[in-house]
């Protein structure tokens, strides 16, 4: 099985793209390999290889050895396992791998994905503990001035039934959350930049604070606004704000939005900077599996989130909606199971990259498989957002096809949720706010937006 002069090509970050069996590292720490792609038969082989990373080891004698528990596995998987272990070592050391190395982690499947998730869960337990915090999601309205090509409530969708919850229904949902131990609400709506909307949210925030003695945490997800509006809402009691960038690639962003001032990539980034300046716990996130998106794009998304120094992240699989322009490109999409797998890997890698942030197990994961949120929690997520919007309105907040709906009585679902989370070795932290530890530890308003 040995081959003299076999080739090992070193890619970005020192990771080898192997043409053959996986072998031990060269004296400078680079992996080298010999031989063609063949199934591993458990037989040791000897060969010579030149390591292209350190330019040493020409004629180096190396031996091919089976990795523990991988007998009968094709060499390409053993090859990947060694690369993954090296990247995990870099992350555990507190360093930042290259985008190419992170993309390799995002390709993990099967046993490799389980290994990645276990590593992330260990870090999560060590750094932020076993708690999973609740955010009661209130979908306040589905009118939107944006016309994003992927979204079911986009401005041009004449088929959607528009609604706006009365203030009393929003307050009732907040009281419900407070009474039932959620400790937090997340108020979400389509984007409205009017002064009337800004004033309405300000009034609601003061009313929620009065109704809950200022104890209920409030997260807002209301799109791009003026910095003065963000500040008004912060002063009225909102402490967290989620504004998803959706992708850190300006080219991909342009393919997802109309080309106008309302849909500016730089404007989105400027809004995130404004939120930080106003003192919010800043959250962002991305979609996984967009048409034309690559694993390298997603790896760069992870690096952007880290560079931006966000306090919380919500990410999930892109789910197509038939009343959107991107529906025409559904033939280009990864299978839904693949989008789920990569989204779970994204959660795990993000936990390793940013150990102290809050990461949400998003509803979009549940839209693919019933235990989608639980898979994210097993990969390091520590926030879950049950939908407490009045049931009659949830159908109308249709961002994507086959969106899961909450139980008829939201309070009845908490014991079941707690049991499922406990089965993962975690604890549903009823009555606890669960503010981002990352925010508490920050010394300065860092972040490259």
Give the ranges of each region predicted by the language model.
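Core AdoMet radical
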Residues: 155-171, 177-272, 281-288, 311-314
């Amino acid at each position: 099985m040995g081959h003299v002069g076999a080739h090992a090509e070193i890619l970005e970050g020192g990771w080898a793209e192997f043409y053959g069996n996986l072998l031990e590292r060269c004296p400078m720490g680079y992996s080298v390999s010999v031989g063609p792609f063949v199934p591993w038969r458990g037989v040791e082989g000897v060969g010579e290889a030149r390591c292209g990373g350190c330019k040493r080891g020409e004629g180096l004698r190396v031996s091919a050895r089976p990795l523990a528990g991988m007998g009968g596995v094709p060499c390409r998987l053993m090859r990947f396992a060694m690369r993954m272990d090296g990247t995990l070592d870099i992350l555990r050391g507190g360093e930042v791998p290259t985008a190419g190395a992170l993309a390799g982690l995002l390709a993990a499947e099967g046993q490799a994905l389980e290994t990645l998730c276990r590593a992330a869960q260990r870090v999560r337990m060590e750094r932020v503990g076993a708690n999973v915090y609740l955010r009661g999601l209130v979908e306040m309205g589905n009118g939107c001035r944006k016309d994003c090509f992927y979204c079911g409530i986009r401005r041009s969708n004449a088929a959607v039934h528009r609604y706006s919850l009365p203030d009393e229904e929003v307050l009732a949902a907040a009281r419900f959350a407070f009474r039932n131990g959620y400790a937090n609400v997340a108020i979400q709506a389509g984007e409205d930049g009017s002064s009337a909307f800004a004033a309405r949210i300000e009034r609601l925030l003061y009313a929620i604070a009065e109704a809950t003695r200022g104890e209920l945490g409030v997260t807002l997800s209301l799109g791009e606004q003026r910095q003065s509006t963000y500040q008004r809402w912060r002063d009225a009691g909102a402490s967290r704000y989620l504004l998803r960038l959706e992708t850190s690639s300006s080219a991909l962003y342009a393919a997802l939005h109309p080309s106008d001032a309302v849909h500016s990539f730089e404007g989105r980034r400027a809004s995130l900077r404004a939120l930080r300046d106003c003192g919010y716990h800043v959250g962002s996130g991305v979609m996984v599996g967009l048409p034309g998106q690559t694993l390298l794009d997603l790896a760069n998304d992870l690096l952007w989130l880290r560079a931006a120094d966000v306090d919380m992240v919500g990410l999930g699989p892109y789910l197509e909606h038939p009343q959107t322009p991107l529906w025409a490109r559904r033939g280009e999409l990864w299978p839904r199971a693949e989008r789920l797998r990569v989204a779970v890997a994204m959660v795990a890698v993000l936990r390793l990259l940013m150990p102290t942030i809050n990461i949400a197990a998003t509803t979009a994961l549940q839209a693919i498989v019933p235990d989608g949120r639980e898979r994210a929690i097993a990969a390091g997520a520590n926030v879950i957002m049950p939908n407490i919007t009045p049931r009659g309105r949830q159908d109308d907040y249709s961002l994507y096809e086959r969106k899961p709906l909450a139980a008829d009585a939201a309070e009845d679902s908490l014991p079941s949720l707690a049991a499922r989370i406990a089965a993962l070795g975690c604890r549903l932290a009823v009555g606890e706010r669960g503010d981002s530890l990352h925010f508490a530890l920050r010394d300065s308003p860092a972040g490259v937006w």
